[in-house]
Amino acid sequence: TEMLVPQSRGTQIMVTAIVLAAGVGSRMKSEKAKQFLEVAGHEVLYYSLRAFDEHPGVDSIVLVTKEEFVEHCQKELAERYQFAKVRDICIGGKERYDSVYQGLSAIGAEGENDIVLIHDGARPFVTAEMISASIACARECGACTVGVPAKDTIKIVDTDHYGVETPERKFVYQIQTPQTFQVPLLRRAYETMYEAKRNGDTHNITDDTMLVEQYAGVRCKVVEGAASLKDIL
């Protein structure tokens, strides 16, 4: 598509949401990708797009999906509901981090203080409060994520599945999205990661907080989420 994300204007901080909708939902016994399943009269992805589109602190949305879903996202979501902030629809990559990088590349030139929120489109219950808290935290700390305290006891196990450590539950959080970063920091972490992978790095990267910790040496602060924000599977 030929939609363009606005560039940084002077000292104004631009805030972009990258919404990931390239998954196929292999854990759900459904022929339809989970982000397009209907919940309360709308597709799951609709709710995330609406939350970011309506938030006054978000300037634009980049939606990342599979090639076969681009037209559907354009016509049945962005145009049908007049989500004016959806400025680009990108085709995702092989891994989750590849899809994020596609979205990041679509943002274009960034100001040094610009912010990007990365959100899983299969988490429909993101709130305006979570978005606001994430933007504020990333502006201050550089990197943050939404998360909730773990309700279950967590065990660290070895390769033989014997427990080797039981962390105190008050220090254990289940990490959700959005995950929010200063754009230059995240871009730098991605460039370092891809360079490392070209040189044989085999780390399994499961989310962007891990990527930033591993390849930029930056700790991510946790913003309080909600149990309802879980992925719908």
Map each language-model feature to its residues.
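Short, low-complexity intrinsically disordered segments enriched in A/P/G/S/L with frequent Arg
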Residues: 4-9
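Short, flexible, basic/aromatic active-site loop/helix in glycosyltransferases
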Residues: 155-181
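N-terminal glycine-rich phosphate-binding loop and ensuing alpha1 helix
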Residues: 13-71
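Acidic helix N-cap motif at the loop->helix transition within catalytic regions
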Residues: 71-77
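Conserved alpha/beta core of the MobA/IspD/sugar-nucleotide pyrophosphorylase nucleotidyltransferase superfamily
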Residues: 174-233
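Short helix-capping segments at alpha-helix termini
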Residues: 55-57, 79-85, 109-110
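Conserved beta-loop-beta/alpha segment of the NTase-like Rossmann-fold superfamily
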Residues: 88, 94-157, 176
